[in-house]
């Protein structure tokens, strides 16, 4: 069952061992666990619905609460502290475009605002219900999850927009195909959500960002239906798909999406390379990205993230053996880890990996093989569960991401981390901040920073 006030399935945990907790305590102090609000108390505070009856609209408090917030830290704090400011007045679960059309007509008739909900994994406040006199209807798309068409000749697949990542991949893999879009929220986010938030997957180097994968679709708007036909390319005017990409539900409800698919790779490998310092690691990573090699992923962790991830992983003896070897090879306290992924035909993928390793070794890179890469792939959708466990031990975790050209990557990383650590300095609190480059381009990179700090014991203190 999905957690009502945290991330993911409540049967899955990311355990933190004694060494990991000691590491956090040394960095920022012992955690201060919070007493969370109960689900019953959160539901009890919800106001009555202002919507008139409709056969598709559910008004139960637990349903309204489940569709009220996403996964940003402010959303978490509202749920954990029981400070639910506002929720939708009702939630509908359509199973067809016709039902979405019916719901939009209903919303217009009763003057309701509409918020479109998929997996509720947004960290940007997309699901926040505005205060005001108008009622709010949430349209939850997750019952619209069928594959409607598979065109193997054009390598296009059309899905209802509410399909979750694992369901989408399972339907494609049954025919030997993949979309290849794997954001960290993959297990609980939807195709429609990816499109309207301009999502990027972990293996975007091979498969492309969602704007490269989105070929067309269908949108229901209050004024009528908008069909976006598929074209391999066009030189005729504005690309109407750009109206939908990143629109975050403001234009209308994306009910169908046609995406560009790829044959399942015959071969896939993820390999870890360590560098003695950030300067060498960033230079090597830039050289690999600008070499335009046929890789599927590059992910570079700075020194503090590398240390943090190795510590939180447990397996103290194995990590100790690795670090002894790396020190012997010249990668000591400031070491940074680069994860390299290669997917496709075996010969081509192996050739791309070899070329990347040549560039890495020129800058002092130490290749440690596939074992860490296999472990990363196994846990890549599990690491986000750390937020739940950290909270239980009295710590909050938040993230921020931006993208800059290569000359600005390192200055941006340092500026973000300095700002984060200074944020609570006036209160005498420490912040554990670390960064990785999550999406790499010839022009620049996405800078993804994580902050860990102790809970303050109050909603206002934790939010500050």
Residue spans for each PLM region:
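N-terminal flexible segment immediately upstream of the FAD-binding catalytic core
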Residues: 1-105, 123-155, 307, 312, ...
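General structural feature for long, well-ordered alpha-helical segments within catalytic domains
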Residues: 16-24, 47-53, 76, 80, ...
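C-terminal substrate-recognition/cap domain of FAD-linked oxidoreductases
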Residues: 56-78, 282-464
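Short, well-ordered beta-strand elements within core beta-sheets of diverse protein domains
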Residues: 90-95, 270-276, 340-342, 400-402
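Residue-level signal for inorganic ion chemistry
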Residues: 96, 107, 224, 340, ...
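FAD-binding subdomain of flavoenzyme oxidoreductases
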Residues: 145-301
